[in-house]
Amino acid sequence: MSAVKPLEAVARDRVGKGAARAVRRQGRVPAVIYGGGQSPQSISLDANQTHHLIYGGGFLTTVFEIEVGGRKIRAIPRDYQLDPVKDLPLHVDFLRVTAGQTVAVEVPVHFVNQDAAPGLKQKSGMLNVVHHTVALEVSPDAIPDAIDVDLTGKDIGDTIHVSDLALPAGASLALDPSETVATLVPPTVLPAAAEEAAVSEAAPAETTKEG
């Protein structure tokens, strides 16, 4: 489960494109906190810190405790915009989170213990991944960093379905339980056949001289 992270912010009185450009010139990123039955709160964040948070991974699945004007607001990033040329953050949208609320998040799927899967280790099969991420409806306090799929004992022909995924308590998936997450498939070319073909191509043809 992702830990709640502290984040310092400064309240913004002015909004609009001109005000946003002025904020960026000061080395900060304009942002807004909305939802929770309250009026939107315009804030600004440190640009360097925001850049590191976005590119550090898991930004959109992390709950932040934002301190602004002596108040602490729990919120989760819903979206952010990047400069199309410099890839620097231009704006961040946060959603307030409250007790009993659930949020929709995209969580990565990690496939673990691949060396313990006979279909991959001994038979040189391939893991054909259909879903690298899955959409969860989950409590903000229970958002996982990732959903791990254990491949121990998996062989060629085995399929991992959505119903096989281990979810946090109270979480639900938007996908059909019977939908495929990944399958173990045979190698494109069998290792032995590929090796024999390589040897055949490398060996010079024998010729017999008649004397």
UniProtKB/Swiss-Prot annotation:
Keywords: Ribonucleoprotein, Ribosomal protein, RNA-binding, rRNA-binding. Pfam families: Ribosomal_L25p, Ribosomal_TL5_C. CDD domains: Ribosomal_L25_TL5_CTC (cd00495). One of its GO terms (cellular component) is cytosolic large ribosomal subunit. Disulfide bonds: none annotated. Coiled coil: none annotated. One of its GO terms (molecular function) is 5S rRNA binding. The keyword RNA-binding applies. GO terms for biological process: translation. Belongs to the bacterial ribosomal protein bL25 family. CTC subfamily. This is one of the proteins that binds to the 5S RNA in the ribosome where it forms part of the central protuberance. Part of the 50S ribosomal subunit; part of the 5S rRNA/L5/L18/L25 subcomplex. Contacts the 5S rRNA. Binds to the 5S rRNA independently of L5 and L18. This is Large ribosomal subunit protein bL25. It comes from Methylobacterium nodulans (strain LMG 21967 / CNCM I-2342 / ORS 2060).
